[in-house]
Amino acid sequence: MGVRAQQKEKTRRSLVEAAFSQLSAERSFASLSLREVAREAGIAPTSFYRHFRDVDELGLTMVDESGLMLRQLMRQARQRIAKGGSVIRTSVSTFMEFIGNNPNAFRLLLRERSGTSAAFRAAVAREIQHFIAELADYLELENHMPRAFTEAQAEAMVTIVFSAGAEALDVGAEQRRQLEERLVLQLRMIAKGAYYWYRREQEKIAHHSE
């Protein structure tokens, strides 16, 4: 990569980080102004268009980055699990770390999931689907269950995890710890239920084939 290309990438990165830094519990992406984001990134507002077509393209890039960041962290969690950690507890701890370290990235995913922009809703849905698919792959490999079962289990788990994440954004450390314990219990219940449901289905098949 040449010097000019490196500088362009650095400025683009600064714009993304500037936009993330301006999000908060009170401030959504829709309320950000191009001028403020450009000023925070240290460039003239007119230079913004050298990097993004418009503010929406910046937002979609942020959604993609948030989803990718979360998936990469969960992959690292699965590597930790492979070394002997508890699957559910390690995954929950990693997820809560993500929210603690990147609250605005998670806020963006939550808000735009049901926001007014169809493009943003589709982008968030795509990221969540990637997340579900990766978890289903892992469950299929570990539990030796058919894809239909692991996908249903993964979708239930991700739905509960995102709901808990929304609560975790605005509570203190002690409440977050309690929330984490509740989430571990809920996910274990889903995992047990999926296992017994699958076993029951297998028994039915075996019974009918006799």
UniProtKB/Swiss-Prot annotation:
The keyword Metal-binding does not apply. InterPro entries: DesT_TetR_C (IPR054129), Homeodomain-like_sf (IPR009057), HTH_TetR (IPR001647), HTH_transcr_repressor_FabR (IPR050692), Tscrpt_reg_HTH_FabR (IPR023764). Transmembrane segments: none annotated. Signal peptide: none annotated. Residues 33-52 bind DNA. GO terms for molecular function: DNA binding; DNA-binding transcription factor activity. Pfam families: TetR_C_46 (PF21943), TetR_N (PF00440). PANTHER family: HTH-TYPE TRANSCRIPTIONAL REPRESSOR FABR (PTHR47752:SF1). Represses the transcription of fabB, involved in unsaturated fatty acid (UFA) biosynthesis. By controlling UFA production, FabR directly influences the physical properties of the membrane bilayer. NCBIfam families: PRK11202.1. Homodimer. This is HTH-type transcriptional repressor FabR.
